[in-house]
């Protein structure tokens, strides 16, 4: 339930699909396990996992969705060795060298033979659609995995007018100014971790962890042209996270004190607790994103 990373997108046009329509749209793209000849399968699953019964979980017009991916595990070395053995056998029997086209066809046959016996692994990825702030927050640090989920959502809805979150002023410019001035705008508080680098490909990268970022050693790197591309921050007393210059948020962690706000709900009714946690998390993520947009100078205008 509690998101651990954020890859953020914003809508170009208002999102006006209600819960019922969204649920119906996702139904045609629900997850099903791999058959014997499938390499992978990807589809929407219950938003709240085993406790849930719907593909969309909504509260206060915030929509949680989840997609499941199942992949067959076929080690490349196993395929390579099987192919080499098969090629060697045929070339010896026929006294000729096989063409690349023949080898490629042989490789496909080997893969299809191995698929029914292959182990599988599953992974899930969730996203929170928040029309209130015109954003989609994907619980992933991978842009590729986020795009895979959003491509499936776009296919289900017919269209999905979104772009990656970006700001009018480069994030690294703002973070560098904060570090130079040893000051972050409220309610953000600087932690003890940062990554600095130059804009040129030849420039170096320096990382600081568990270190006072106001020390001369850190500031000296800024003086010679490096900029802050990653900075660990606190959002008040509720969230710790690592902000990146590409607007990605990693290592998102809600404090124990904040999560304890739902302790009175108890755990006797799992669905009630999940509902409460979803509401608590959603409200705080909205507050976080609104505050980030404000202190980072506003989002970049849509093209």
Curated annotation (Swiss-Prot):
Q: Which UniProt keywords apply?
A: Cytoplasm, DNA recombination
Which cellular compartments is it found in?
Answer: Cytoplasm, Nucleoid
Read off the InterPro entries from this record.
RdgC
Gene Ontology biological-process entries = DNA recombination; regulation of DNA recombination
**Could you cite one Gene Ontology molecular function of this protein?**
double-stranded DNA binding
Pfam families per UniProt: RdgC
A single Gene Ontology CC annotation of this entry is: bacterial nucleoid
> What this chain does, per the record?
May be involved in recombination.
Under the heading NCBIfam families, the entry gives: PRK00321.1-3, PRK00321.1-5
Q: What family is it from?
A: Belongs to the RdgC family.
Q: What is this protein called?
A: Recombination-associated protein RdgC
The species this protein was found in:
Shewanella sediminis (strain HAW-EB3)
Q: Which gene encodes it?
A: rdgC
